Amino acid sequence: MKTHRIAVIPGDGTGPEVIGEGLKVLKAAAKKFKFGLKTKVFPFGGQHYLKTGKLVDEADEAELRTFDAIYLGAIGLSGAGAKYVDPGILEKNILLKLRFDFDQYINLRPVKLYPGVASPITGVSPEVMDYVVVRENTGGVYTGMGGIMMKGTPNEIASQEWVYNRFQVDRCLRYAFELAKKRHTKKAPFRGLSAEAKAAGRTARLTLCGKTNVLTNVFGLWERAAKEMAEEYPTVELAYRHVDAICLLMVQDPGQFDVIVTDNMFGDIITDLGAACQGGLGVAAGGNLNPDKGGVSMYEPIGGTAPDWTGKNGINPIAAIGAAALMIGNLGETKAAEAIEAAIAKTTPKMKTQLAGQMGWTTTQVGDLVAKSL
C-alpha cells in the first residue's frame, strides 16, 4: 500500500475549518481505495507571524521538500478587530516564496459547474461548463522587474516589466498540451469540436489566451511557441483568442473551451472570472504545480480567510474538498480523485446555496455528506 506524505498548512480564519473537512474526505477515500496518508501540520500564517515573528525560512522549506504535496487553507489577516500586518509580508514571504522557491510554474484552475450550483450565467449546464485554465505561474509582470523614478514629482515614472523566456513558455505549453491530450479520447472527443476537426483526428482543444495585437513581443513568443509545439500533438486542435474575447466568451459561450493556457497576469484575471461563472469561490479549487519529477505542488481552495465566519461552522468546504481531489489525483490516485469529484456532485444538489451560512448544512455536515457519498 502506497502512503502519501502531505504537509498541511491550515492557515488563518476559516482555513483550518475547510481543510479539516478536506482531510476528512481524504481519509475516507484512503480507506476505500487502499492507500495511506501521513500528514503533518505547519503553523504558517498571519496569526503565527504575529505571535512569533516567523514566516517561512530555509529549514522550513527543506522539511517541506520531503513531502509529496502541500495542502493549504488560506493565509491573511482581515476583518473587524484583526491586527495589522503590512501588505505583502505574508504574501511574499509565505505564498509567493513557496511558489517561486519550489518552482511551482503551473497554476491549475478547473472551471467546473457542479449539479445544483447556481451560476450567474443563465441556462448553462454542468456538461457545457467543464474546462481547465493552465496559468503560467512564475514569470511575466509578477516577477517584480521595474521601478519608480523621480518619485513625488510631477514627472514621476513607474514601470513594471512583462518578461518571459522561451524556457518558461515552452514548459507551460507542454503541460497544457499534455493535459488537453489526456482529457479526451477518439471515442469520447471534446464536445465543442466541429465535425471537420473530429474527422481530422482531433479529440481536444487548447486555446491560447493572449494579446498579440498589442503586446506583440511577449505574446508573439507565446503564439509562435504554441504553433511549433502543436505539430507534436495531432489530436489537439490549437486555437487562439485575445484576452478580452476570452472574458466575453467565458460568459457567453463557455462550452467552446476545453483547456485554456495563458500567462501569469491574464491567468490571474480569467481564473477568478471562471470561479464566478462556476458559482463562486466556495466551489473553486486550484493547484500551484511543479509537475517535474520530485517537484512538490501546493493545492488550495481559492477563497480567502473569510474572517467573519471563523468558528461559526458555516463556511463552504466544497472548494477545499475539490482541492483535495485534485491533489490526490495528481499523486496517482486517479480512482479516488474521480470518486471524490462524484461525491461532490452528489452533495451539491442537496445544498440550498453555496453561500456561507446559507447552505442548509453546517461546514462539518457538508464534509460528512461528501465522505458518506464515497
What is each PLM-predicted segment?
Residues 48, 89, 248-351:
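Glycine-rich phosphate/nucleotide-binding loop
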Residues 22, 26, 226, 320-328, ...:
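Buried hydrophobic packing segments
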